[in-house]
Amino acid sequence: MTDRVALVTGAARGQGAAIVSRLRADGFGVAACDLRIDELNACVDALDDTGVIAVPLDVASADQWSTAVNTVVDRLGSLTTLVNNAGVLHRASLAEETPAGFERSWRVNCLGPFLGIRAVLDHLRRADGAAIVNTCSTGAIRPFPNHAAYGSSKWALRGLTQIAAAELAPSGIRVNAVFPGPIETPMLDEATQARLVAASVSGRLGKPVEVADAVSFLVSDHAAFITGAELVVDGGQCLRIG
């Protein structure tokens, strides 16, 4: 058992897997949560660490959130930290976007974090150093054409982060957000990665561990007086968008 226990969503690969590894290195017990059960189990098994557990979770299901939180507390002893990292991305023009595609983006990218915050509140209110980090996007800082579903859902998550930070500060719960730019993850296909590198101020994509480092800081005691913050991890991408 450890004093600090984090629940991380979207943890089967990419950024989420990097966040799990980094928080474990920081001394957290970590519940790695994802819909991709086989990938999740393989990722956690590879760590060979009893301080990391795999927990199936569809972030758009309130019932699954309740079950996941109970599992985490039963197996790891407490819950002090939530990282809402799960997300989906697809490109479509306004004319080509579908109601189903739009709704799926909102259910995963915004409803999911809301359900997560609600599910962990009782535990975080009892915790010392309680913290929540939401994974937003540079798409919630600048408007990206052909990203109506993704972009609008991340703008909403940005707003939810601010509201939660204001509401939960009196309870000692800090709520912050990271805003990754182009990161080398399975979410981006090779053609998209090449296009983003060509347009990058930094001449490269970010690495998942660089986002994980930002999350690590925001949930740590070094950020004890920081809430409602928006930490951009984009290699200068937003400097080139206007």
What are these regions (language model features)?
Residues 142, 216, 227-242:
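Short C-terminal tail/terminal secondary-structure segment
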Residues 117, 153, 161:
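Active-site helix of classical SDR
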Residues 2-30:
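Canonical Rossmann dinucleotide-binding motif of NAD(H)/NADP(H)-dependent dehydrogenases/reductases
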Residues 137:
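Residue(s) in the substrate-gating loop at a strand-loop-helix junction
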Residues 169, 174, 226-228:
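Short, small/polar-rich loop/turn modules that mediate ligand/substrate recognition or access, typified
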Residues 93-95, 101-103, 196:
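Substrate-binding pocket helix/loop in short-chain dehydrogenase/reductase
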Residues 122, 166-167, 224:
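Alpha-helical segment proximal to the catalytic Tyr-Lys
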